[in-house]
Design a protein with these regions (language model features):
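Polysaccharide-binding and catalytic clefts of secreted carbohydrate-active enzymes
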Residues: 1-194, 212
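Active-site clefts of carbohydrate-active enzymes
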Residues: 22-46, 216-247
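Acidic (Asp/Glu)-rich catalytic clusters
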Residues: 66, 192, 210-220, 261-262
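ATP/nucleotide-binding catalytic cores
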Residues: 72, 172, 248, 254, ...
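Structural motif
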Residues: 77-78, 177-181, 202-206, 225-228
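An N-terminal assembly and electron-transfer interface module characteristic of large anaerobic redox
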Residues: 89, 99, 243-250, 256-260
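Short, low-complexity, polybasic intrinsically disordered segments
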Residues: 195, 199-200
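Conserved small/polar residues in nucleotide/adenosyl-binding loops
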Residues: 268-269
């Protein structure tokens, strides 16, 4: 379809908002595009709000625990919703758009309807697009957006706890990764302790991210240092690819993190 913008002024940028279904889950997309996953199946995101999806996830979690009796710690990576992250084929500019604090990927038709039923008003696309500023962590959220965050957080905790309880019932500990699909987990929210997680893991580029992990109460803290053992680093550097320098990358990240380590309560690195 065609959208016509009227009254446009020179040198101004305009956005057209729309709701789309993403068929290709973005972590799978990232690894295929940057790390050449080849014939590995393209994964699709699921909507955990539907009873059928929840039943499948509970069955899968139970079956996994049954088949892996020797595993003592289960890492959730992380819960159900990822931040906004899009990749493209251009080798000179892989990252199309990323917003680590964005709740845009939580906007399914069912969630929007349930929110309106609970709060008495509807979210609009502009509440998420925010005049093109979007909703990254350095932007103060609106009252409506904070209500949406609370709405999602309540659901993620209530259903997520069921999966964690399954892990605990098999005598295993449950850790959560404070990165991929972390949206709705909100480790600094008042509800986080209701999950029952035993530990929190975070991959870190710098001291700020190290403190972000260590500041969460009631869990074991674990840092995961960069670079990852992938050909391409998360910021596009060819760490383990031809022309890369993993020693230099590791040294740079270590320098950025080490001062913060002196003041943190950490158990694992």
């Amino acid at each position: 379809e065609t959208v016509t913008i009227t009254g446009a002024e020179p040198w101004h940028s305009y956005t057209v908002n729309f709701l789309a279904v993403r068929l290709w889950e973005e972590i799978s997309m990232y690894n295929h595009i940057t790390n050449d996953w080849g014939d590995k199946e393209h994964l699709m995101a699921v909507d955990p709000r539907y009873p059928e999806t929840q039943a499948h996830m509970i069955e899968w979690m139970t079956e996994w625990c049954e088949k892996n009796p020797d595993t003592t710690v289960v890492r959730f990576t992380s819960m159900f919703y990822n931040f906004a992250w899009f990749w493209k084929d251009d080798k000179n500019c892989r990252d199309a758009f990323s917003d680590w604090g964005s709740y845009a990927m939580t906007t399914t038709p069912l969630a929007l309807k349930e929110f309106e039923k609970k709060y008495g008003y509807a979210m609009t696309s502009e509440d998420f697009v925010n005049a093109g500023l979007y909703t990254s962590t350095h932007n103060v959220p609106s009252k409506k957006y904070r209500a949406w965050m609370d709405f999602i957080n309540e659901f993620v905790v209530s259903f997520g706890k069921k999966l964690i309880d399954i892990v605990h019932s098999y005598g295993k500990k449950a850790y959560v990764f404070y990165d991929d699909s972390w949206i709705g987990v909100e480790p600094y929210s008042k509800r986080f302790k209701e999950f029952g997680f035993d530990g929190l893991i975070k991959c870190v580029f710098n001291g700020f991210e190290a403190r972000l992990c260590a500041g969460v109460d009631g869990v074991t803290h674990e840092l995961r240092f960069h670079p990852y053992l992938f050909p391409t680093g998360l910021t596009g550097e060819p760490t383990f690819a031809p022309g890369g320098n993993p020693k230099l990358d590791a040294s740079r990240y270590w320098v950025n993190v080490r001062r913060a380590l002196l003041r943190l309560s950490l158990i694992h690195i």
